[in-house]
Amino acid sequence: MAGDQERRGRGAHLEGGAQETTLKTQPAQAEGEEGGRPHDPKLTLNVSDGAVREMEAGATGAAAGTVTPDGRVVEFTTPRAKLIEEANRAIRADLRTYPRALAAYEALRADPEALAHWDMANYVTMRKLGYNDHGRVHAFITGAASLAITELLLDAGVRTDLMESGVGDADDVFLAIILGTMLHDIGNQIHRTGHEAHGVALALPILDRIMGPLYPDAFKRVKVRSFILGAINSHDLSPAPLTIEGGIVAVADGTDITKGRGRKAFALGSVDIHSISALAVDQVVIERGRGKPVLISVTMNNSGGIFQVEEVLAPKVIRTPMRNFVELRAAIRPQGEEQILSRVRLEGDHFVMDLGGGETVRVEVEDTQKKVSDAIAQNLGVSAESR
């Protein structure tokens, strides 16, 4: 996810700080109300620190932590199992009128090979590289986001490439989107480098196993599968996606930039502009736009969050077919900026960072000059000491 913008820190230690995450999905409002723009977002990912936060009831009147009878308003808090449970509920609600896509999703979330792929991709990216979450939680969150985007596009009359090519209908589109989104990062278990191509190879047997019973016609099955594989291969813009389906997967991937994701990497030692800027993003909202079908709004608690918008999310809008369909906005929350970093001091070979929330982080200082010298010496075939 998010290309090489997710770098790692070294030797960091984090103390203190609980957090909570909220995902809310709601049905689009009927046309004619405020020019067809809904009062409530299609999907909101909201994160706040401290104790569980009371959420305001939406237009449906649902209280925090409840689900309306149609299953379209959900809110979740960490721990991880609860987050996945509620994301699953949101995805199933979005797919309830698309039987083939829903069947594919149910098969995927219970597939032992897929579960293992998510866990190992997360192990490599978080434990070995110090990156943000790329496992099961990321798959479910981005899956919910991708369906919200897809529904808004189809509601606006947009015909995706899968439909325009005559390969399939809306049910096939939702199937391709949910499978492509949830499998897009599994290649990280082999290595971050080339993870897109690795993901294609690893996804193939899973897709064939899931799609076989749903598409008895191999000719159509292979065609639908091509859109999924293309989305996996291009989700990190290397290469950039050529289809709307690929663009949806890439943009949905880019929306998972809230501090809930950044703090995980932070706690495991990745302390840099990437993880710190992620702590500055409180909320990502996906809703119907005014000038375009989709509006993605980012609410920041600190202006440092603009790095996440500029380096992670915006390129996935600009460099994909989604640039024609998505508005992107970012703003500081109404109550003003939050202090993320209050002081940095050097103690021995570590920077000690005092965070605004009272947490303390120790980061090993990298000897950049020595690393450069060693690299040059190695290239010349001599040791740094002999020169």
List the model feature ranges, each with a label:
Residues 209-222, 239:
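Inter-helical turn/loop segments and adjacent helix faces that build the functional surface
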